Amino acid sequence: MIYADKFLDEAFHLGFNTYTGVPCSFLKPLINASMESDRLSYIPAVNEGDAVGIAAGVYLGGGMPVVMFQNSGLGNAVNPFTSLIQTFEIPILMIATLRGDPENEPDEPQHQLMGKITTQLLDLMQVSWSWFPENHDELTK
């Protein structure tokens, strides 16, 4: 397990200073910690596509953005990601929680299909991705 403050510290040392996204119960510790931090900014978004657009603006304004949302909202982010982020090679760190776990962990039925196709969708969008680190040692690699 990685504590939110440890993740934020490591990300800050890599230059990430602005967080954006939509509410997600799995991301609540990261969202709350980024909102409470004196050295970070958190900009709430009304949907996942807007979060990607906000991240682009943060980068163009000199910041380093982190976008956070559930994979169930990845579909909302496809167009701004492919037509803006990819086209203009804007670097962002995206954290998408995995709902509808493909390993058949119980979840809500509306998440099942997106859970199955999330990694394939990221590959189709030519997004470099990896699983979130499970502990602090993995985080610092």
Language-model segments: residues:
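Thiamine diphosphate
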Residues: 1-141
